[in-house]
């Protein structure tokens, strides 16, 4: 490995570290909300869980669309186009506010749809309470994502981490204070949990905006100046790239929702074991997610600067390093599944014996699962850095819903594989996705390098 490669890997990891911490802080906020629902009561946990799942599906799509901001800003930054960076970020904020309004209106009117889908009336009623206040978090969430993409694309992800961690702590403290009625605060139940999340999320966006406005590192990008004048061309560019990214997020979330339905059809033991394994995998998954974001930004910078060779190097380094890290997690899950399960359950309680055995089997499968999932996630980020989200969407759609979902169903039910069969089906789809996306990145960069060579050979 040549010294420039070491330097490139260090830059990627320095950018990825704060983004990984930010992702974990976001997960902690979701975990806090779930714990607080449980403190209210089992009915609130069930109904709040339904509301949270509905909100998550819609917000994941919106967050995926907003990921286009970071990609396009990194390309403009690499090209030295300061005005383009500013205009894209402004358009990203307008897109965030527009999507937040539409998504909130949809969430506020979901109650009859959930009833039509056969959800229990009591759960739907509780979910509707949660969804009265929670959608107010959307303007802050999506604005934060737009500004996160902007500052990360400039190589400055530290403020994102600091604000995210502070937000997670504030979310826990305020929720706990409201549930226990400290300082005379009212216990508003699920509405209160949604209200706290909305307040904290909007404050996070305002804090990041204030930092960007005040810090001299952003002086070349006066985002507040001319913000009222929406650039339709930049908005269209964001939407064109962001829509397939949001679609990819949606089909992946849909796949794991499908897996949960499969487990629910099998029984409570399978569902419990699935949740333990999935929560474990999801926490480790934040590492490749952070690396993927960093790789997207770094490749975008090289692509914008016209340095395709370094773009390919950055992608290969990110995919290789991320895959290696996830392989280590896989080995750990393989060798010490009971230690992991012990974080969730009392291993000595005979009531949990069947769940422990099944969860250990799923974590053994997760050893492979993690490597494939991490690799395909970073490869997706690498391709998006080349301003291509259509390829990632089509590969994701095919591998998730034409391979993973049918395989999970067939192995789980028709081959009598049970919960393990479902997970092997998911692993098969992720394996295919990892191979296809890695090949697609290599093919795209090779084609761009050939074009570059032809262009250099043609006399000016």
UniProtKB/Swiss-Prot annotation:
UniProt keyword annotations, A-Z: Antiport, Cell inner membrane, Cell membrane, Ion transport, Membrane, Transmembrane, Transmembrane helix, Transport
TM ranges: 9-31, 51-73, 93-115, 125-147, 160-179, 189-211, 238-260, 275-297, 318-340, 350-372, 393-415, 419-441
Record membrane topology: Multi-pass membrane protein
Cellular compartment(s): Cell inner membrane
InterPro entries xrefs: MATE_fam, MATE_MdtK, MdtK-like
GO cellular component, one term: plasma membrane
Listed GO MF terms: antiporter activity; xenobiotic transmembrane transporter activity
GO terms classed as biological process: monoatomic ion transport
CDD domains: MATE_NorM_like
Keyword Translocase set for record: no
Alphabetical list of Pfam families matching this protein: MatE
Principal location: membrane
Similarity comment: family membership: Belongs to the multi antimicrobial extrusion (MATE) (TC 2.A.66.1) family.
Function, in words: Multidrug efflux pump.
Full protein name: Probable multidrug resistance protein NorM
Native species: Pseudomonas syringae pv. tomato (strain ATCC BAA-871 / DC3000)
